[in-house]
Amino acid sequence: MISKINFVKMHGLGNDFVIVNKRDLSSSYDLSQLAKNMAERHTGIGCDQFIIYEEHNDFYEMIIYNIDGSSAKLCGNATRCLAKLIYLDTGKQDITVMVGNKKLLCNVNDENNISVNVGSVSFNEAWMPSRDKVWEFAERYMIDLKETICVDIGNPHVVIFSKLEPQDQKIVGERLQAKELFADGVNVNFAEVKDNKIYLSVWERGAGLTLACGSGACGSFAAGLKRGFIHSPSTIVFKHGNLTMKEENGNIIMQGAATLVARGEYYCEQ
């Protein structure tokens, strides 16, 4: 039997998503497998992450799947994309998005300028290994991590203030998934600071190197502030565009564009 699923394809600075309203999904779907199928770039729609959303009385719930079918706890670019989609479909400008227990306050200033208040970050969580353990691991694999800091933005990130070539970023990103360091994996950010801007590349757990990462931008901005490398406001620079970042009363606010690519129908065999 073949069923039809309405979808929207969007991207935030090249970080792309397939977005589906939960009401269009049958309860019989294996969502993890559906995510893998739709995310496949040759036989599916193609995306970095698969997003399901559901409207409630005063907020929208967002569920995030990686291309390997695993779940993710946060995605800043997907949040901006979902906020824009809701704005286009309903006209709402102030939108609350819930991802698990994380509340994200969104404002659509205009179609190309969406801000997301992601709240506070933490530099002291149980999942974070000691600095000595990270350095010991780095030396074993001959990885030059230079200035490194862990940050929790609702999902786990490690920020490496070091310039590495893409092939080396891939190696480091994969090796830092070692269970002895990060039991559930970690998002790895490669940050280079120039003139109060952070030039950022991100290796996302469950996805690999992506063109942009909103939560990585937030975590790297917070880490840069903590280390004194930058001041607020600042700019995060990705290959296909920038995000403006600022800190207000301990909260991190991300601002940038989101792009609607297509609306369509996906045909699914059950």
Curated annotation (Swiss-Prot):
Quaternary structure and partners: Homodimer.
Protein name per its UniProtKB record: Diaminopimelate epimerase
Highest taxon in the source lineage: Bacteria
Source taxonomy: Bacteria, Pseudomonadati, Pseudomonadota, Alphaproteobacteria, Rickettsiales
SUPFAM superfamilies (alphabetical): Diaminopimelate epimerase-like
UniProt subcellular location: Cytoplasm
Role according to the record: Catalyzes the stereoinversion of LL-2,6-diaminopimelate (L,L-DAP) to meso-diaminopimelate (meso-DAP), a precursor of L-lysine and an essential component of the bacterial peptidoglycan.
InterPro entries: DAP_epimerase_AS, DAP_epimerase_DapF
Pathway: Amino-acid biosynthesis; L-lysine biosynthesis via DAP pathway; DL-2,6-diaminopimelate from LL-2,6-diaminopimelate: step 1/1
Entry keyword set: Amino-acid biosynthesis, Cytoplasm, Isomerase, Lysine biosynthesis
GO aspect biological process, one term: lysine biosynthetic process via diaminopimelate
Main location group: cytoplasm
Family from the record: Belongs to the diaminopimelate epimerase family.
Active site: 75, 213
Assigned EC number: 5.1.1.7
Catalyzed reactions per annotation: (2S,6S)-2,6-diaminopimelate = meso-2,6-diaminopimelate
